[in-house]
Amino acid sequence: MITVIKWLVSGCCALAAVTTRAPLPKDCRNTPNSRGCWKDGFDILTDYTDPKRAPPGKLVEYNLTVSQQVIAPDGYEKLGMVANGQFPGPTIEADWGDTIRISVYNNFTDNNNGSAIHWHGLRQFENNVQDGVPGVTQCPSKPGETQVYEFRATQYGTSWYHSHFSLQCECPLNGLFGPIVIHGPSSMDWDEDLGPWLLHDWYHDDVFSLLWVGETKNRGAIPESTILNGKGKFDCNHHNDTRCTGTGGEYFEVNFRKGVRYKFTIANTGTLLEYMFWIDGHNLTVIAADFVPIEPYVTDVVNVAMGQRYEIIVEANADFTHGSNFWIYAQYCDEVDLLPHKAVGIVRYDEQDRQDPRTPPLSDQHRDFGCEDPDLDNLVPVVQQSVGRRVNRMEMKDYLRMGQEGYPDPMNFDGDLHKWVLGDVPMFVDWKNPSLKKLAVDEHPDFPPETVPILLDFDTGDWVHFVITNNYTFEKVHFPRNLTPVMHPMHLHGHDFAILAQGRGEFDPSIVPKLDNPPRRDVVNVDTGSYVWIAFQVNNPGAWLLHCHIAFHVSSGLSLQFIEQPKKVKPLMEAAGVLGEFHDRCAKWTEYYDSVNIPDNHTIDDSGI
């Protein structure tokens, strides 16, 4: 057994990442019975939290053309946004340590949309300019323009890419997203990889009409369907709409063989709904949360909030008493009967047996499971890391309080229109003047209040702590008040964060945080009436977004940005040789935007991200 290294905390110093697993042979190879191995000198025990310790890799190149076309994933035709004509878009695939170069051509010539692609969960270490957030890390690319993103895969696991350009392209509302797979070691052995399973809610209506539903009625618009890997079912029998094709779509299907250990990653790429996910008749062994390998734990159901990913192993050992076909389920965690179809796919042990699986009655467990993240005790990182003392303030006035306020008058709670906030004001960005432009040009950058900046001008290795609250029961005490009791999956760009505490009710400052190897991930669900205490190291200069991954909420302003080590940003961009291209894109976008939008009096209808 390897010796556990524990470094003493002195002030705010960073602590070493360690592991208590037995070391692996130096010459081991990645096989079905040794998935913890990878390449010479690199395995599941390697400290991937240090981006500079990634294995040597190769250059992997992809070309994506983003455009509009009619799609019907659930049997109902709508105008959607696709990558290379595919929905979901093609898989971006590489090995841990590879450099990934992706050329994105904006072919939105028919709707005048800009484009910017975010690579969800990838840290972009010392490479903020590649994060793909318009108004924060870049100006959008105009129609007819190609933008080249290039970054190193310093983490491994499965995630996804998606547009971050306003609600017009946001997430799966219109379809512009696809999977990212970074191959690496696993914390448990498996036989066959089934790849990414992208799960999301699907809407038929115009996206901005849906946003107005949430901002005026204080309740998110209900989706028509649930889609798994681009396939779903919608009942056309009760609709005379000619866009309903009559076939009602199709289920996602996968074939199992008895005794085989299958690995896949379930990712919620959705807009509004957090899903309970399970496969009838099978247990799920969870081996990673987001991009963090964890000690395996067994469950029969897992909640997946928007933006979250869980790497799962399923052993094909089902009981055939009631047949050899089994439903794959995804239901909304809060209202189990909200959507007509809970079944989203089929596992078949016999390809020739085309019957639908038996549908057992919904158990009390599946009705009352709730919307909380997995217990923190289950999310134990394989590579351990202890959290140091904070260097920032964490008084009650510093809490990041989620809620709604009146708009345009924030004190008019009884008006028709409301915006979401994470603190004092809803976030709005300027596509022509992103935060990174200020950091790269201005000696003393000035950030408007509506860009919601939080300055992290600390030394490399310092730890910062934040409390995020979603306690709607205190609407008469705290400002802003939350008119809508709903969970919020909070996603941080540029970092994994440690979860030091999570619970219901008002946050108590006397709570003892979990500092010794707490769970780490990049999306945490802050359930209704709850709080979460997170921490991360200051080590990645740039402007990094923290936002709710409910598309309607981020579009309505529920975001902020951390301005991290601002004086180091410009030197990093100069060293990378990207300043010229960065400014050139902004100049082209400004000229294009002014020529197209100002004459027609078009303005940004939402936060811009």
From Swiss-Prot:
Signal keyword on record: yes
SUPFAM superfamilies in alphabetical order: Cupredoxins (SSF49503)
Domain Plastocyanin-like per the UniProt entry, residue ranges: 66-186, 196-351, 429-567
GO MF annotation list: copper ion binding; oxidoreductase activity
Broadest EC class assigned to this enzyme: oxidoreductase
Tissue: Specifically expressed in conidia.
CDD domains (alphabetical): CuRO_1_MaLCC_like (cd13854), CuRO_2_MaLCC_like (cd13880), CuRO_3_MaLCC_like (cd13901)
Known EC number: 1.-.-.-
Keywords for this protein: Copper, Glycoprotein, Metal-binding, Oxidoreductase, Repeat, Signal
Top-level taxon of the source organism: Eukaryota
InterPro entries, alphabetized: Cu-oxidase-like_N, Cu-oxidase_2nd, Cu-oxidase_C, Cu-oxidase_fam, Cu_oxidase_CS, Cu_oxidase_Cu_BS, Cupredoxin
Protein name stated in the entry: Oxidoreductase tpcJ
Annotated glycosylation sites: N63, N107, N113, N240, N283, N471, N601
Function: Oxidoreductase; part of the gene cluster that mediates the biosynthesis of trypacidin, a mycotoxin with antiprotozoal activity and that plays a role in the infection process. The pathway begins with the synthesis of atrochrysone thioester by the polyketide synthase (PKS) tpcC. The atrochrysone carboxyl ACP thioesterase tpcB then breaks the thioester bond and releases the atrochrysone carboxylic acid from tpcC. The decarboxylase tpcK converts atrochrysone carboxylic acid to atrochrysone which is further reduced into emodin anthrone.
Organism of derivation: Aspergillus fumigatus (strain ATCC MYA-4609 / CBS 101355 / FGSC A1100 / Af293) (Neosartorya fumigata)
Family according to the record: Belongs to the multicopper oxidase family.
Pathway: Secondary metabolite biosynthesis
Signal peptide: 1-16
Disulfide bonds: none
One GO process term, biological-process aspect: secondary metabolite biosynthetic process
